[in-house]
């Protein structure tokens, strides 16, 4: 029970505790616990949900597109610990105190829905996806059998089928996963199982030295997956890229031949469509030719760039993707389906996913059920409990239609082009390279460095600029923008356009604000 001091402000819905406890005459007790009736106060709970939803609407949804609001209310960790009541006590907190905590959580959280949040490969607020998330949180389903999740399994099937069509396959299979990293791990394991099915039961002891190949610009999840699966990071061969960050096919084939010469067993090539930093797209047709010649599984990590498939204008970036054996595609990025919404799509239609991952749990996947058990898809996943993530994307797709999703991609890339043109016009801004996608990489050169020769001292000083500007913008709360060093290049900004709430004015503001924050450096 809460202390008297906690209950100075009574809340509607509070009831006399005596009303919740049955009289001793009628009470049924087991181990001293009264079992009569529910012990939750439904009225108080419903009122709390209603008030919390109102708070979310007022403080999150209605402010999501307001550029006058801060992107973040920065506090260092130790200070934030003092500002938030993080302690969990023996007695519960009253509803009004919980609402205060909710307000604090919103206030000090980064507003990723803000039009000037450019920090990651996700951003913005899709209202339809948000409602879908409210629904799934309230329903609390787990997507593994049709009996407990009939609607969401059918939705997932419909969404996967449509995504497979956009890749260009006539048929296929797939599953939604908690992140593109997991999709890449699934694909790596699936390729290994296809190459050496005995590994599932007999393990690695009798297997050859398996080797996989991926771009030097690949996502770091490839190394993590190799480590997690016992393949080993030393058996990940990184293929050199050209000046734009694309895998060089000739270098790939050289490495494949070298691995065979050393007695290793190549089994997988992972190409990337939309690299994390530069936004590069590997030449899929040429890579697929090599995979066919050497009987290698081709996986395409299109977690970031896959959404370009929705655009008739930009889908050429992924030319040849139909030749892949598997594809990772994250609708929660460019298509704003809400984190997490990530699919692994597989060309194989012989139940390879189920063969690779099934454990045939008898308490879940009984074969004598009264309905078609082919809809029980849980054995295609390494998870048991699994969220209905496809529903978020389905709701957005239903609301906007394919043409609306196409317009979302086209507009984001048009805004990117506008920003590139503005960078070229402005003194003190320098593009790293012409972008291929929505990743705009550039340096800001403050006035104090503009007359310096581009030698070691210049680059050493420029390396300090982006982190210092990032600190200032975070503490001011005016915008958020990512930066990084990359393959020998000193720290530069990476700006990504995603949200349809972003305008031309926001692009202009971004450049103006960087100049304002950095001109005295």
From Swiss-Prot:
Signal peptide annotation: none
Taken from the UniProt record, the cysteine pairs bridged by disulfide bonds within this chain are none
EC annotation from Swiss-Prot or TrEMBL: 4.1.1.11, 4.1.1.29
PTM N6-(pyridoxal phosphate)lysine: at which residues?
333
Keyword match Ribosomal protein: no
User: Gene3D superfamilies under this entry?
Assistant: 3.90.1150.170, Type I PLP-dependent aspartate aminotransferase-like (Major domain)
Q: Which reaction does it catalyse?
A: L-aspartate + H(+) = beta-alanine + CO2; 3-sulfino-L-alanine + H(+) = hypotaurine + CO2; L-cysteate + H(+) = taurine + CO2
Q: Which GO terms describe its cellular component?
A: cytoplasm; cytosol
Keywords noted in UniProt: Decarboxylase, Lyase, Pyridoxal phosphate
Query: What InterPro entries does UniProt report for this protein, alphabetically?
Result: PyrdxlP-dep_de-COase, PyrdxlP-dep_Trfase, PyrdxlP-dep_Trfase_major, Pyridoxal-P_BS
Keyword Ubl conjugation annotated: no
Q: How would you classify this enzyme at the top EC level?
A: lyase
An example Gene Ontology molecular-function term: pyridoxal phosphate binding
Pfam families assigned to the protein according to its UniProt record, in alphabetical order: Pyridoxal_deC
Expressing tissues: Expressed very weakly in neurons and not detected in astrocytes, brain or liver.
Q: Which cofactor does it need?
A: pyridoxal 5'-phosphate
Query: What family is this protein classified in?
Result: Belongs to the group II decarboxylase family.
Q: Which PANTHER family match?
A: ACIDIC AMINO ACID DECARBOXYLASE GADL1 (PTHR45677:SF1), GLUTAMATE DECARBOXYLASE-RELATED (PTHR45677)
How does the record describe its quaternary structure? Homodimer.
Q: What is this protein called?
A: Acidic amino acid decarboxylase GADL1
Q: What's the gene?
A: GADL1
């Amino acid at each position: 029970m809460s202390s008297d001091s906690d209950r100075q402000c009574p809340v509607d819905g509070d009831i006399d505790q005596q009303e919740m406890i049955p009289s001793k005459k009628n009470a049924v007790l087991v181990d001293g616990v009264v079992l009569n009736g529910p012990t939750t106060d439904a009225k108080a709970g419903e009122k709390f949900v209603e008030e919390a939803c109102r708070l979310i609407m007022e403080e999150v949804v209605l402010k999501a597109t307001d550029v006058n609001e801060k992107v973040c209310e920065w506090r260092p960790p130790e200070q934030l610990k003092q500002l938030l009541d993080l302690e969990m006590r023996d007695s519960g907190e009253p509803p009004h105190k919980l609402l205060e905590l909710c307000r604090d959580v919103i206030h000090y959280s980064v507003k990723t829905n803000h039009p000037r949040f450019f920090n990651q490969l996700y951003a913005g607020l899709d209202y339809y996806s948000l409602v879908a998330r409210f629904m799934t949180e309230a329903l609390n389903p787990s997507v593994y059998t049709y009996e407990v999740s009939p609607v969401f399994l059918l939705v997932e099937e419909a969404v996967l089928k449509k995504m497979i069509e956009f890749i260009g396959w006539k048929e296929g299979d797939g599953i939604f996963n908690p992140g593109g990293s997991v999709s890449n791990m699934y694909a790596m394991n699936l390729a290994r199982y296809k190459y050496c099915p005995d590994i599932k039961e007999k393990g690695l002891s009798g297997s050859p030295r398996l080797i996989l190949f991926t771009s030097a610009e690949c996502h770091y999840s490839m190394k993590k997956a190799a480590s997690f699966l016992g393949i080993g990071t030393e058996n990940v061969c990184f293929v050199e890229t050209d000046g734009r960050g694309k895998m060089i096919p000739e270098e790939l084939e050289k490495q494949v031949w070298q691995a065979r010469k050393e007695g290793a067993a190549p089994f997988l090539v992972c190409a990337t469509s939309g690299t994390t930093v530069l936004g590069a797209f590997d030449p899929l047709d040429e890579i697929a030719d090599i995979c066919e010649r050497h009987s290698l599984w081709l996986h395409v990590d299109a977690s970031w760039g896959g959404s370009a498939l929705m655009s008739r204008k930009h889908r050429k970036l992924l030319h040849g993707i139909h030749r892949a054996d598997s594809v990772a595609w994250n609708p929660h990025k460019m298509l704003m389906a809400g984190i997490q919404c990530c699919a692994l799509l597989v060309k194989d239609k012989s139940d390879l996913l189920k063969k690779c991952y099934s454990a045939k749990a008898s308490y879940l996947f009984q074969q004598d059920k009264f309905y078609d058990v082919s809809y029980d898809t849980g054995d295609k996943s390494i998870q048991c409990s699994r969220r209905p993530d496809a529903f978020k994307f389905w709701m957005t797709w239903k609301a906007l239609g394919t043409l609306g999703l196409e317009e979302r991609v086209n507009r984001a890339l048009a805004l990117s082009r506008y920003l590139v043109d503005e960078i070229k016009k402005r003194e003190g801004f320098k593009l790293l390279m012409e972008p291929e996608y929505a990743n705009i990489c550039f340096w800001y050169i403050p006035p104090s460095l503009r007359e310096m020769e581009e030698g070691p001292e210049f680059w050493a000083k420029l390396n300090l600029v982006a982190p210092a500007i990032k600190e200032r913008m975070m503490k001011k709360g005016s915008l958020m923008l990512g930066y990084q060093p990359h393959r020998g290049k000193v720290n530069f900004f990476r700006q990504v356009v995603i949200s349809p709430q972003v305008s031309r004015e926001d692009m202009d503001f971004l450049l103006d604000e960087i100049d304002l924050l950095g001109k005295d450096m």
